[in-house]
Amino acid sequence: MLKRALLLSLVVLLVVPVVVRAQPSAAPETVGMSKERLALIGQALNGQIEAKSFPGAVVLVARKGRIAYFESFGQLDPKTGSPMTKDAIFRLYSMTKPFTSVAAMMLVEDGKLRLGDPVGMYLPQLAKLEVAVQGTDANGKPTYTVVAAERPVTVYDLLRHTSGLVYGGFTRNEYVKDLYAKNNVGWAGVTPSEQLDALAKAPLARQPGTAWEYSLSTDVVGRVLESVSGVPLGRFLDDRLFRPLGMSDTTFHLPADKVKRLAQPLATDRATGKPIVLHDVTVAPKNDAGGAGAAGSTADYGRFVQMLANGGQLDGKRLLAATTVRHMTSDHLGDIKPAIPLLAPGYGFGLGFAVRRADGLNGLPGSAGEYNWGGAAGTGFWIDPKEQLVAVLMTQAQPGAWQREFRDLFRQLVYQAIID
């Protein structure tokens, strides 16, 4: 009888879904924010929806560890007209990168990885790389000479995007851009080995450690993590990050029972009229792309960023040391200059995040030490330790620089709602 009871109890535990504990909420005024001023966020986002920037959005603002504002606007799917819901799931694109960067620092804390390690220690394909050095001819036209890399690319280079790797669509090194296109160097539709083999065939755009260039570096960090841990990146993140934080909706492959919660973009771009096509997270990927492949909900991401804001812990569970979080969110560029104009004025870059260097030097509000990142389809977050503030914005929109319009508006309205 006892055995039967124990068996039934086990079955119940396996069948009943785990209830994720939500972050605590608070009346805005109790955490130094104005309810009336926060309401301006909704007015502004509804204006963006009417202007066809995106069909819907979910936003979360927390201060002093408690949620002051968590709202949804517009439509989840413009084809069906279904309303946006707070539990909607979004393609995160580059907001995947902070997950992978945090996971790398977990292995550093475990003593299984060092930032100064050459990447070739873990990925032999990338042990001996070349560099396409740019020059100019007598007519001022660019020339390229392929030479050996002066030193190996390190894990540190990957995390701060000084590896010499690029994104083919961003780089100004035309020689490397052409080879990336020819050899299908990217993050989607390739296996891990295919990705690494393609990267090995293309030279770096710059000598390692000499310039900041946003790139596939974080995807390579994911391959390093797989080599060290012996498991796919998605499984490692599930075990060490997502499950411990209760991030039950964050994944590289959205299961069938959650597809109805996936937010969809407008059919066409408002500026060009061309169809908007986003990454399909409902199909099992050939690789867990640590730089762009995840999807997740606003509440999930809110828990992740609150963990960072708390110095590496949430709900009594410590995932990182506070010293590690401070190290990751410090500027690691110094005098190293960006090769492409992607970092906002007044920002450097840490180990996975853009980092604000001063209260000023930028037309938008923020504090020195604030750190942030975003995703191509209209997602973004920032953490301001000085203000004890975290903010998450989720939309699904046409990728492009034009998104700064609504991203900047959201930031401005969050800061104007602080009243203490």
Identify the residue ranges that each predicted region occupies.
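Bacterial N-terminal signal peptides that target proteins for export
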Residues: 1-8
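Bacterial N-terminal signal peptides
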Residues: 8-17
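Boundary at the C-terminal end of the N-terminal hydrophobic targeting segment
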Residues: 20-24
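Short, conserved catalytic-motif segment at the N-terminal edge
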Residues: 29-92, 112-114, 128-137, 277, ...
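Active-site SXXK
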Residues: 39-46, 59, 65, 90-122, ...
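Short, surface-exposed loop or secondary-structure junction motifs
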Residues: 77, 124-368
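Short, well-ordered beta-strand elements
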Residues: 380-382, 388-397
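Generic C-terminus detector
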Residues: 398-420
